[in-house]
């Protein structure tokens, strides 16, 4: 099993050095392209000529490349070495809890990153400024507006998304039916609570 951890802070810093009209291409290449198979399964295109595409989706919750400014460095700097190590340890601990029970994982490569959330986004606000997407095996996004509250819950969020990621290696994804979402979210947050305590449960329960 191999974890491919894409540390986004260096990419965000690079984006700040580029003209605005060059930023989207670099953002897509360095942060989204490793997840292209995930988006294909979700039927989300990289072709920006299609009205709903990967950048449209990113815009719902995230700080977009064109909107980045030097003022965002304070948030970017919070994606530091300790932050990435915390994510790595939470991933390994979560996955090991399944392996130790004799569960043989079908997926051997896992791509993980964290993206800057947009604090003005209604979707981000209703999620208390942090969220995740781990429903496609092998791929996990974490999204957050970095602050003490959200960073303290990033390990729990990783456990939640790992539960989704492993469960969907054995359960067919039903394109997000309400019934399946209720079951999936309940199981994932129960697992996160078991791993990191009730004090770190998310707003999804």
PLM regions: where:
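N-terminal low-structure segments adjacent to metalloprotease catalytic domains
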Residues: 1-85
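Post-HExxH zinc-binding segment in Zn-dependent metallohydrolases
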Residues: 2-4, 178-205
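Short pre-active-site segment immediately N-terminal to the catalytic Zn-binding motif
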Residues: 142-157
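Charged, well-structured binding/catalytic surfaces in domain cores that contact anionic ligands
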Residues: 149-151, 163, 179
């Amino acid at each position: 099993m191999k974890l491919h951890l894409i540390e986004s802070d260096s990419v965000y810093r690079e984006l700040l050095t580029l003209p605005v009209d060059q930023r989207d291409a670099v953002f897509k290449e360095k942060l989204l392209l490793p997840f292209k198979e995930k988006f294909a399964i979700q039927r989300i295109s990289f072709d920006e000529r299609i009205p709903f595409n990967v950048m449209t989706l990113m815009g719902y919750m995230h700080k977009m490349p064109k909107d980045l400014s030097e003022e965002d460095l304070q948030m970017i700097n919070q994606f530091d070495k300790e932050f990435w190590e915390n994510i790595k340890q939470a991933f390994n601990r979560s996955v090991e809890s399944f392996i130790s029970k004799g569960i043989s994982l079908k997926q051997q490569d896992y791509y993980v990153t964290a993206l800057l959330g947009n604090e003005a986004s209604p979707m981000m606000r209703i999620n208390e400024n942090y969220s995740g997407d781990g429903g496609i095996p092998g791929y996990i996004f974490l999204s957050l507006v970095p602050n003490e509250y959200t960073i303290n819950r990033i390990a729990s969020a990783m456990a939640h998304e790992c539960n989704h990621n492993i469960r969907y290696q054995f359960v067919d994804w039903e394109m997000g039916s309400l019934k399946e979402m209720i079951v999936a979210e309940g199981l994932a947050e129960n697992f996160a609570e078991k791993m990191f305590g009730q004090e770190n449960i998310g707003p999804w329960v």
